[in-house]
């Protein structure tokens, strides 16, 4: 691996080893890095970092693409069922790869239940929809999930219950789900950055879940004086998640807390935490709310190409369904 990186200008065996230790295992990782990130590595100057990045971008053929090429790339997108046909319809077929989907809502609105159900559905071939002309079939073989839990709400027994409700082995789902408990924002960001190591180790990570995205940031950065620092850090985290989605054709799901809108006289009285940083970085944004009994309402209110719409789904003992 170090021999490959030495093809870059100014990168000898020693520098290559430092890059690998820092997680820069291939040209694409270097090509999508910033000069500041590379200069954090001992012995790499700004000038050397700029040369490395430009050379890596040339080797990865990064640059302008025609609309036809982008349309062809879109054919590699695959989708995962949420468990609810109505919610899948709102999403034009299901949760989409190469994107970040946010589910925000009050406690008990169903955010974590959707995350658990997604881990289960990933192991069911009939819940995965792909255009086999655009997706290499082997790419979706033996898919695995990563679940970064920041609130201590991941319940393996609930995953087993949902799996058995669909007639599959719950142990299989758990075997293919990596779980990490993050107690602060630094741990949360580190776990997200380590996902590439899992992929390089031969794990076919196709689903990444952060539950919840903003709770650690919200707890650590209190008051207006720390808002700018919080948003900058959150922005870097979202950039990591978007990069994972793009480079590895995986689905990224995040849950989000809400806060009251004191100036809201009409309409929605809550708003998702994270402000414009999360708003611009998330591809699809849902707001969840409780309805009667086991029913929940999911409102899609932000998407690059889908209209605003709502879906009603149920949270049952067997999982998410219509």
From Swiss-Prot:
Cross-referenced Pfam families: HHH_5, Rad51
Keywords per UniProt: ATP-binding, DNA damage, DNA recombination, DNA-binding, Nucleotide-binding
Residues where ATP binds: 105-112
GO biological process: DNA recombination; DNA repair
Molecular function via GO: ATP binding; ATP hydrolysis activity; ATP-dependent DNA damage sensor activity; damaged DNA binding
Gene3D superfamilies noted in UniProt: 5' to 3' exonuclease, C-terminal subdomain (1.10.150.20), P-loop containing nucleotide triphosphate hydrolases (3.40.50.300)
Family per record: Belongs to the eukaryotic RecA-like protein family.
Described purpose of this protein according to its UniProt entry: Involved in DNA repair and in homologous recombination. Binds and assemble on single-stranded DNA to form a nucleoprotein filament. Hydrolyzes ATP in a ssDNA-dependent manner and promotes DNA strand exchange between homologous DNA molecules.
Name of this chain's protein: DNA repair and recombination protein RadA
Native organism: Methanococcus maripaludis (strain C7 / ATCC BAA-1331)
The gene coding this protein: radA
């Amino acid at each position: 691996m170090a021999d490959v990186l030495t093809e870059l200008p100014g990168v000898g065996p020693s520098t290559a080893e430092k890059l690998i230790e820092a997680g820069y295992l291939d040209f694409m990782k270097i090509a999508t890095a910033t000069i500041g990130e590379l200069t954090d590595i001992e012995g790499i100057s700004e000038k050397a970092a700029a040369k490395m990045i430009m050379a890596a971008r040339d080797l990865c053929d990064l640059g302008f693409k025609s609309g036809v090429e982008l349309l062809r790339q879109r054919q590699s997108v695959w989708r995962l069922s949420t468990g609810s046909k109505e919610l899948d319809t709102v999403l034009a077929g299901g949760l989409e790869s190469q994107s970040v989907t946010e589910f925000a809502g009050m406690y008990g609105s169903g955010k974590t239940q959707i995350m658990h159900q997604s881990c289960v559905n990933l192991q069911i071939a009939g819940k995965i929809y792909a255009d086999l002309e655009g997706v290499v079939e082997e790419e979706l073989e033996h898919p695995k999930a990563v679940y970064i839990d920041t609130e201590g709400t991941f319940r393996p027994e609930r995953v087993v219950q949902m799996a058995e409700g669909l007639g599959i082995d719950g142990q299989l789902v758990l075997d293919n789900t990596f779980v990490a408990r993050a107690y602060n924002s630094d741990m949360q960001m580190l776990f997200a950055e380590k996902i590439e190591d899992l992929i390089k180790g031969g794990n076919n990570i196709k689903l990444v879940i952060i539950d919840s995205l903003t709770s650690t940031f919200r707890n650590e950065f209190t008051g207006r004086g720390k808002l700018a620092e919080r948003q900058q850090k959150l922005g870097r985290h979202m950039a990591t998640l978007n990069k994972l989605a793009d480079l590895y054709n995986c689905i990224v799901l995040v849950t989000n807390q809400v806060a009251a809108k004191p100036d809201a006289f009409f309409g929605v009285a809550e708003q998702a935490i994270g402000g414009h940083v999360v708003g611009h970085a998330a591809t699809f944004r849902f707001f969840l709310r409780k309805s009667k009994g086991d029913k929940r309402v999911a409102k899609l209110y932000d998407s690059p190409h889908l209209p605003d719409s709502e879906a009603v789904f149920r949270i049952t003992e067997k999982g998410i369904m219509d």
